[in-house]
Design a protein with these regions (language model features):
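Intrinsically disordered, metal-sensing/regulatory segments
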Residues: 1-259
Length: 259
């Protein structure tokens, strides 16, 4: 196994920890929770719809008629969203989580914990194919692998933030938030290692692009169903909206800078 692609994939995955460290700089608060949820939601939506979707349409457009290409990509995106929604329903509800924070419960902390769990699980699913993609890109062309790792690291940072802030708020422990962010990124090097050991023949370009679209569906669902609603907290609506706007704009700049 070549060392360089694994190193690139590991660094890209661990960049979620940088998002966790950024979250640890400020004490957890409802305002920070709203702003970070909006920021991460903006990044995830923009990365999915302005970066991953056009790439998938361009790839499958080389093999399928336009209508069939669009139908295939939309179907995969929808399947990813449905998968994320189903997994979200399997997690504990806020009432069950609130009971763990004392006899009286704490709805705000319970909601934050559920957001952290849903987002973290979705990112594990999303990061696995990203790790495979980075690994194979680095194996085929080190320069392409470096650009791919840089692009993935760029949106992994706010993803780590999206996990760390609610986790730190729920647990009242910033270190726990950083660790949660790091764990969510470990799926990338894990995906690379498993791909190399067991799945090399399975990961054709068509299959890999399909898994990326599925992962994009997961991100879209998390952004629309979990992060952006959390950003629109009645008391901190402005912070959430500004966070979402900044996330969208920064991700667009990143896409332009790292094609």
């Amino acid at each position: 196994m070549q060392d360089s692609p694994i190193v690139l994939t590991t660094l890209a995955g661990l960049s979620t920890g940088l998002g966790g460290l950024l979250a640890a700089l400020c004490p957890p608060s409802e305002r920070l929770l709203a702003a970070s949820a909006g920021f991460a939601g903006g990044v995830m939506l923009t990365a999915s719809l302005a970066d991953l979707m056009p790439e998938a349409l361009a790839f499958y457009g080389g093999y399928l008629p336009p209508l069939a290409c669009g139908g295939a990509v939309v179907s995969l995106l929808t399947l990813g969203m449905l998968t994320a929604g189903l997994l979200g329903r399997l997690l504990p509800e806020e009432a069950a989580l609130a009971a763990r924070f004392g006899k009286s419960g704490d709805p705000a902390r319970a909601a934050a914990m559920r957001t952290a769990l849903v987002t973290g699980l979705a990112l594990l699913l999303h990061n696995f194919p990203e790790g495979v993609l980075t690994f194979f890109a680095g194996t085929a062309d080190p320069s392409l692998g470096l650009r791919t790792a840089a692009a993935i690291a760029l949106h992994n940072i706010p993803e780590g933030l999206a996990v760390a802030v609610p986790f730190a708020y729920a647990t009242r422990c910033r270190t726990a938030g950083v660790l949660a962010a790091l764990v969510s990124g470990l799926a990338e090097p894990l995906g690379a290692v498993l791909a190399w050991l067991f799945l090399r023949r399975l990961f054709t370009p068509g299959f890999l692009n399909g898994t990326v679209v599925l992962a994009a569906g997961v991100m879209v669902w998390v952004a629309l169903a979990q992060l952006l609603p959390g950003a629109l907290h009645p008391a901190h609506r402005t912070a959430g909206i500004l966070g979402a706007a900044v996330g969208c704009l920064l991700m667009l700049l990143g896409i332009a800078a790292l094609p």
